[in-house]
Amino acid sequence: MVTIELMRAISAAFNSRDVERIVACFAEEATFCLARGPEPVGRTLKGKSAIRQALSDRFRQIPDMRWENEEYILAGDRAISVWTVRGQGGDGEELNYQGCDIYRFQGDKIIHKNTFWKIVEHKARL
């Protein structure tokens, strides 16, 4: 059963930007679906090695990336984290998105993480 303490520990790991600390939250063969990518689910990372590489790349591009968690919803071996992510990319672009992660756990390890975020459009497209 997922607890609020476990979710706060995962959030603290992500906000530390310590890749090994974050990867330790995942099961060995976990999947992590990023919000952006070439697939309908974004981009699927499979296993700790792929997750480690993607996070290393992300924090290199956005070294001050941080999440402000606003709400956790817990249900058995699943959880949802609602957040705002902020930071500044190497190109100077400000990151400020609202989103959520849907988690599935085995014990206290993440076996699946699916990330969603709002798309900010600066031009009217309607």
Task: Name the predicted role of every residue range.
Residues I4, I10, E28, R36-G37, ...:
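Aromatic-enriched hydrophobic runs in primary sequence
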Residues N15-R17, L34, Y103, W117:
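Generic helix-packing signal
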